[in-house]
Structures are given as C-alpha cells and as structure tokens.
Amino acid sequence: RVDGHAALVNKFLFDQAKIVASNVDGGEVKQINGVPTGLLLDNAMNFVSKQLPAYSSNQVKTAIAEIQEELFQYGITGTHEAGIDFKHIKLFKSMISSGKLKLELYAMLMNSAENRTFAMKHGPYRFQNLYIRSFKVFADGSLGSRGALLKKPYSDEHQSHGLLLTSVKEMRDVSLFCLKQGYQMNTHGIGDSANSLILDIYKNAFKRNPDHRFRIE
C-alpha cells in the first residue's frame, strides 16, 4: 500500500525501534500467534520513524521539483499538501522565492505547538502561490489496512473495529482553535464511526460560528 497508513519493516529495524507493545493508541503492531509480522499500522509506525534518517532540505526540494514537473505535464497547476510541519513552511517559501516552486499550493498544518504559534501570529496566510489556512487531523486509518474506524467489526477481521488515530478531546480542541483563528479544520475520516464522531464535533463547533467551512476528507 502507498497511503501512509501502514509500513512493513524488517527484523533489524523492528529490534532497533525496541517495539514491545502489540497495540498502541491509534495504531497496531500486527502479530500471528503472538509473533510480530513486521506490519505496523498508523500510529505504530511512529516507533520506527524516529530510527530512519531524515531527508535533507536539498533532497526534499529535488523531489518537489520532480513532482511539480510531472504534474505540469498533465496540466495540473495546483495541489493540496495534506499535513506539513513548521519547517516545511520555510522550505516552500524558499523555493517560491527562487522561482523553483510555481504550483498553487494549499498547505494544511499538522497540529503542533509550532504550527499553532504560526497560525496565531499570522492568521490565514498567503505568500505568493502558497496558501496556509487550515489544520489537518487524522480521525482514523484506511479501509485497506483495516484502520478505518467502523461501527461494526470488519467482515474478515471480526475482532477489529479499526483505529481512532486522534482522540475526540484533541479533535474538539483543534476545532475550537481553528474557529478562533479563522482556519479550516480538514479531517481525514473514512469509517462510518469516525465520520459520526467528526460530524458531532463539527456540529458543536458550528453552534459558535455556523459560517465556517470545515471539511471531511
């Protein structure tokens, strides 16, 4: 799968990460007869992400330039980036200033302290073709990896209803923060249970400000 909701790691990396829990909040370490398979779902991937070397700024810029060129070949001139860290804002601005990033880019912020500080300082933000006015939240995982949060168990995995990646408390907090800052809240929601939770959170937020454009994606 190429969707950011599952990872398959070898024994060396598994041992380096010192994974001991079979399940974590919003994630799962898949096992067969109590033996880890190396398949990590959603938040369980955080165990190994810290062990991997980070891409350099130049590597990221090169990758973005290559992707941009391919998009232009298909006539696509704008895109959304669903979840960026604070460091990426500076990187995007640098590429725009040097003329290397020409795509219209609607970037969503991950819910971090640095990104919240940015939103409070700047409000809805635009730098030439870069637009920042939303926060990205993940309520659940994907159907294919059995991470989407369902009201009923999966038909081929009866013990599982899926995963709640972000607590209801945190999602409520983000919704009120976004209302205050004039930002959108863009929530990943696949399963019926996850969507029900998101709609309840949005309904409560819209009582305070009904003229707001949150979305589920």
Segments from the language model and where they lie:
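Catalytic pocket of metal/acid-base enzymes, prominently hydrolases
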Residues: 1-108, 126-179
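C-terminal active-site-proximal or functional interface alpha/beta core segments in diverse enzymes
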Residues: 71, 207-217
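Short catalytic-loop micro-motif centered on adjacent basic/acidic residues
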Residues: 77-82, 106, 184-189, 214-217
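Acidic-and-aromatic substrate-binding clefts and catalytic sites of carbohydrate-active enzymes
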Residues: 82-88, 113, 193-195
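Distinct, well-ordered alpha-helical segments
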Residues: 90-95, 116-121, 195-207
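Hydrophobic, small-residue-rich alpha-helical packing segments that form membrane-like cores
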Residues: 113-115, 132
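Short acidic/histidine-rich active-site segments
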Residues: 143-146, 183-193
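Long, K/E/R/D-enriched contiguous segments that form extended
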Residues: 174-180, 192-197
